[in-house]
Swiss-Prot record:
Highest taxon listed in the record's lineage: Eukaryota
Lineage per the UniProt record: Eukaryota, Metazoa, Chordata, Craniata, Vertebrata
Any one Gene Ontology BP term: lens morphogenesis in camera-type eye
Protein name: Tudor domain-containing protein 7
Job description of the protein: Component of specific cytoplasmic RNA granules involved in post-transcriptional regulation of specific genes: probably acts by binding to specific mRNAs and regulating their translation. Required for lens transparency during lens development, by regulating translation of specific genes in the developing lens. Also required during spermatogenesis.
Length: 1071
């Protein structure tokens, strides 16, 4: 828990950055943008943030306007009043005043602290009182402060003599604040905003080593500070957050640690080791004791004991008590158990889910109080807070090396000093003798984002597949290098040949195709060399000794080939059937890549995108392992009994199971797995890395079944297909289990035991099945144990005839079949089917004739908009910025400058969470009949996702025209894709805001202008400056007139209306 005065100091610093105060509703965001943490008001004993702010009047002054909005202002104190006075005195000429008046981004705030450090140095006796410095500022407007200030780009001013020493306040700022990674992706880069200080040469060279400050204490020199930091890290050998080192330093030595020192820690390898841990767009830094210990240093035991004696005498009783409590509740065994759980969730685990997983795994209760203070686990995992609720955090496991060190893992290999020195000497000699070794070639940089394509050039082992990256950044560079090598060695035929080849040497090789390749010598055998051309193609070739030549021309070009591993195929890498399948599917093909793990040998999923449908190569190769004896071989005109229907789709197709040897074998294997898992900790088999095509286990109705992951919607929700029943559902990642390794081969070799089929003898113009017919079929064939069927045609799906199993075979007549009965029911319903419209006070619903509306135009709504959803069932309208204000938005749809849809950027996280909950609920819920009415709210399934929609019209043949309320899109969907919208999904305001671009004249926009506008703004985060709000009775019908600003380009703000006007002028000139 943070100290109250520490939080108050940080809060005062946040409030000082805004001249006009900060609204209470934005205070948490501003606090976190500066410190990287939320205001822990609940930990401090307050129910609300306003109550906490009201309890510290010496720090915060509260103002409440006529509308009831609360604004917080900083209260001046002796530590900061002189800064405010000095700033006001220079407000007309000094651009530094912008740092005190405006709400700053993180990087500028840190630069302000550097300015205050410089001012503190000026009062040192060693400095002249007439010190001047020049400040050059490149000011970039922030999204929520896009205003123009008229000031000079540089000015010179003098620090006044009367300015007393400013005592700097240290508060925990996460090291991430100094990284560009903290700035959100939608916010522009301010990296070019720099300060340049030019100090006069008035330094007193005879100044003493340490100087006095206003408090009378002596400031230690650099050597003493470094020794103190070493002492702190020797006690905390499990690591200390860089953001916490200043606090621990102050509590231990009763002195503040300068921010300049914090910035220099990364450049002091003899003092500490800094490890960077990335999670998403954020980067954290952890300090560890220096790995290189000088020979003169005492042993580890003596050093630890000495450092503990030094620090324990200076640590306060409060800190000591808290550390004892932490050690009592967070033992090494407990933390190791937490690590074992988090390792299975590399994409992160919600903190509130940890207690249940812990109890399931270890049959012990999760310690109380840990969730309220997740920093106790910070040495083994990264805690990412997503709201002001402490439990609403995501935990990420740290790297293995970091975790082992944090858990005091001492079982490490000790290398004797003599052997180590000999090895280092040999390594240095080899580098001097062969400077062109492979280590001199730059490593291949794996693309960090965007689509990645590779060329598969060697498939000898799926665990070491040889690929070459293709694309403009790779293929072009490779071809250019080959051309240069060919030109160089062709002109320099006398280039020195290898006289004494050595293993590991990098050489150039002339191939039969008149090309020159880079290679490394891997063996020398009786005047013949074995080379590995892995700098380019990774193939092992043998040449005569005189053939290779020294490669000094292209050593600095990075390799374009790399080894990779195909996930899911590791266990079967030695199977010849699998190797043949991999070669058939991938060899010498350009494939798309999904990178699951970035390591020395990255883990991939390959996709063949050359056809109409993308083929998952990993999943396809597994099918080569199927045991042919377990496959279902159906014969035409053959009667099969004891058939079970397992799934019926909305288009009338179905999946069936037949008694077979494969089904019996599958049941036997799943029973053995069930018995095995009963005696194991099931959490050990949690799916840690889900990907499309992965085969897992899912507990359905008390029995384990095989499922294949088909869609990954989010970190929690997945779309799966039941391999042996044909059902499709959405499940949570935590509900899936890995197949135990000892049963993996048995499970994979059994082919799917469900066959896809359809009914025979249906009229050719049946068309789309009506919902009533599908429901009738499900009621009559699902959950019945036995049927008889006869195969009529064998295609990609079987065309079947069905009979009830209890009918004797002698009575299997055509008129008694399910086919004929469903046929009659289908046409009976098509004659009088209607879509009901239930609105109070409305006329009876219109009937359909043969599935068609009375109106001839199928695109015209069958029912006009009459009546709207009651106000109590509609969520509150989305709060917007005031006229003239700025807000971050995301443009989801862009038709033309006169109509586009924006979403508030800060609410996108909440919307994604809502969509995830809807997917999980509706995919598992039973379908219910729905009374459709216009202007009513529903949940609709569109492209495998569930959305909140309002029905705009009812079309013929069971189609609906709907408007997606959170994305602003119009869609036409089938009526069977609609379900009631629950109350819990109506709380979040609808996110789509209709908008019109300000600054341009309203007109009939041409297709060319619309396309240019759409390509410029659609699917992009921008800044909106609202000029007008046109209210409406329905929240989804109101419209805003706004400017749009693109701030993604450093140092440049692109106003979209200027871009549109310029584009229109160019189009006019072209005409």
């Amino acid at each position: 828990m943070q100290e109250p005065d520490l939080v108050a100091k940080a809060l005062r610093s946040v409030l000082h950055s805004s001249k006009h105060g900060i609204p209470l509703s934005e205070l948490q965001d501003e606090y976190r943008s500066l410190t990287g943490e939320w205001i822990p008001f609940r930990h401090l004993g307050y129910a609300t943030l306003e109550a906490y702010v009201a309890s510290i009047p010496e720090v915060v002054r509260i103002e409440r306007n006529q509308t009831g909005e609360v604004t917080c202002h900083a209260v001046a104190c002796p530590e900061t009043i002189y800064v405010r006075v000095w700033a006001v005195a220079h407000k007309r000429t000094s651009p530094i005043f912008l740092l005190f008046c405006c709400r700053q981004n993180i990087e500028k705030t840190l630069q302000m602290i550097r300015v205050l450090d410089i001012c503190a140095i000026f009062k040192d006796p060693r400095w002249s009182s007439e010190v001047s410095f020049v400040v050059s500022v490149s000011v970039c407007l922030r999204r929520d402060q896009l205003s123009h200030h008229g000031f000079k780009r540089s000015c010179t001013f003098t620090c006044p003599e009367g300015l007393p020493l400013i005592q700097m306040v240290s508060f925990p700022i996460k090291s991430i604040l100094s990284e560009k990674g903290l700035i959100p992706a939608y916010e522009k880069n301010h990296s070019n905003s720099e300060f340049y200080f030019s100090l006069t040469d008035n330094l007193n060279a005879s100044g003493v080593e340490t100087h006095t400050v206003a408090s009378g204490r002596s400031v230690p020199n650099i050597s003493e500070i470094q020794n103190r930091i070493k002492e702190i890290l020797s006690k905390y050998r499990n690591g200390v957050w860089l953001s916490k080192i200043a606090q621990v330093y102050e509590e231990t030595y009763r002195e503040e640690l300068s921010t300049t020192v914090l910035r220099q820690l990364e450049h002091w390898p003899h003092v500490c080791t800094v490890e960077k841990v990335r999670t998403g767009d954020q980067t954290y830094r952890i300090l560890y004791p220096s790995k290189r210990i000088p020979p003169a240093v005492k042993s580890n035991t003596e050093q630890d004991q000495a450092s503990q004696n030094v620090t324990s005498s200076k640590a306060g009783p409060v800190l000591k008590t808290s550390r004892e409590a932490e050690s009592a509740s967070c033992s090494s065994d407990f933390k190791q158990n937490v690590v074992n759980i988090l390792v299975k969730y590399p994409c992160g685990l919600w903190a509130d889910a940890l207690p249940k997983l812990y109890q399931d795994a270890y049959q012990r209760k999760f310690p109380e109080g840990i969730l309220n203070n997740l920093q106790l686990l910070s040495d083994v995992c990264v805690v990412d807070y997503v709201s002001n609720v402490p439990q609403k955090a995501i935990l990420y496991v740290k790297t293995q090396s970091c975790t082992d060190e944090n858990l005091n893992v001492t079982e490490k290999v000790q290398i004797p000093d003599g052997a180590k020195a000999t090895a280092e000497q040999q390594h240095e000699e080899s580098k001097e003798q062969y400077p062109e070794s492979i280590s001199s070639v730059p490593p291949l940089v794996i693309p960090s984002e965007g689509p990645v394509s590779v060329l598969v050039i060697d498939v000898n082992n799926p665990n070491e597949l040889i690929i070459r990256y293709v694309g403009k950044d790779y293929s072009g560079a490779q071809e250019q290098m080959e051309d240069k090598m060919k030109a160089y060695y062709s002109k320099n035929s006398t280039a020195s040949q290898i006289t004494f080849p050595s293993v590991g040497q990098l050489v150039a090789v002339h191939t039969e195709e008149e090309a020159w390749l880079r290679a490394q010598i891997i063996s020398v055998e009786d005047k013949r060399l074995k080379l590995s051309c892995f700098c380019t193609y990774f193939g092992c070739i043998t040449f005569r000794m005189c053939k290779p030549k020294e490669n000094t021309h292209c050593c600095m070009k990075q390799c374009t080939s790399h080894k990779c591993k195909l996930t899911g195929l590791e266990v079967f890498s030695d199977d010849p059937l699998l190797l043949k399948a991999v070669e058939l599917q991938a060899y010498h093909k350009i494939c798309a890549v999904e990178i699951l793990e970035r390591s020395d040998i990255p883990v991939f999923v390959l996709y063949d995108t050359s056809g109409e449908d993308d083929i998952n190569i990993n999943a396809t190769c597994l099918k080569a392992l199927y045991d042919k004896s377990f496959e279902l071989n159906l014969q035409v005109d053959t009667l099969y009994t004891n058939v079970r229907v397992t799934s019926i789709l909305s288009d009338g197709n179905m999946y069936c199971q037949l008694p077979s040897e494969g089904l019996s074998k599958l049941s036997e294997v799943l029973q053995k797995i069930e018995y095995y898992l009963l005696h194991q900790e099931t959490s050990e088999f949690n799916v840690s890395q889900p990907y499309c095509g992965k085969i897992c286990l899912f507990l359905c109705k008390g029995k384990w079944t095989r499922v294949e992951i088909t869609i990954i919607h989010s970190r929690r929700a997945l779309g799966v297909r039941f391999i042996d029943t044909g059902r499709v559902a959405y499940v949570k990642v935590t509900d899936l289990r890995e197949i135990p390794s000892q049963f993996l081969r048995e499970v994979i070799k059994i082919p799917p035991q469900a066959i896809k089929c359809c009914l025979a003898d249906l009229p050719p113009d049946t068309g789309m099945w009506t919902p009533e017919a599908v429901l009738w079929l499900r009621d009559n064939v699902m959950d019945y144990a036995e049927f008889s069927m006869q195969v009529s045609v064998m295609e990609k799906r079987c065309v079947l005839k069905f009979w009830k199993a209890f009918i004797p075979i002698s009575y299997l007549l055509a008129d008694r079949s399910i086919n004929r009965r469903i046929n009659a029911v289908l046409w009976k319903h098509q004659k009088d089917v209607f879509l009901s419209v239930t609105s109070q006070g409305l006329a009876p619903p219109k009937h359909l004739n043969q599935g068609r509306l009375e109106k001839s135009d199928s695109l015209e709504p069958a029912v006009e908009s009459r009546g709207v959803e009651s106000a109590t069932d509609v969520p509150p309208p989305l709060p917007l910025s005031e006229v003239g204000g700025f807000m971050d938005v995301y443009v989801s749809v862009a038709c033309h400058p006169g109509h586009f849809i924006v979403q508030p950027w800060k609410e996108i996280h909440n919307l994604e969470a809502l969509m995830e909950e809807m997917i999980l609920y509706y995919s598992m819920a039973e379908e219910r009949p729905v009374n459709i009415g216009t202007n009513k709210l529903y949940a609709a399934k569109i492209e495998n996702r569930w959305y909140r929609v309002i029905v705009k019209g009812i079309l013929r043949k069971g189609f609906l025209s709907v408007y997606v309320l959170d994305y602003g899109k119009h869609e036409v969907i089938s009526i069977d894709k609609v379900q009631p919208l629950l109350d819990k999904f109506r709380k979040l305001p609808f996110q789509a805001i209709k908008a019109e671009l300000a600054g341009v004249k309203s007109q009939q926009w041409s297709e060319e202008a619309s396309i240019i506008f759409r390509n410029r703004v659609e699917k992009k985060p921008l800044v909106a400056q609202i000029q007008a709000i046109n209210e409406s009775t329905n929240s989804w019908d109101r419209k805003v007139v706004t400017y749009l600003v693109d701030t993604s380009i450093p140092d440049t703000d692109v106003w979209i209306h200027d871009f549109v006007c310029q584009s229109l002028a160019e189009l006019s000139e072209a005409d």
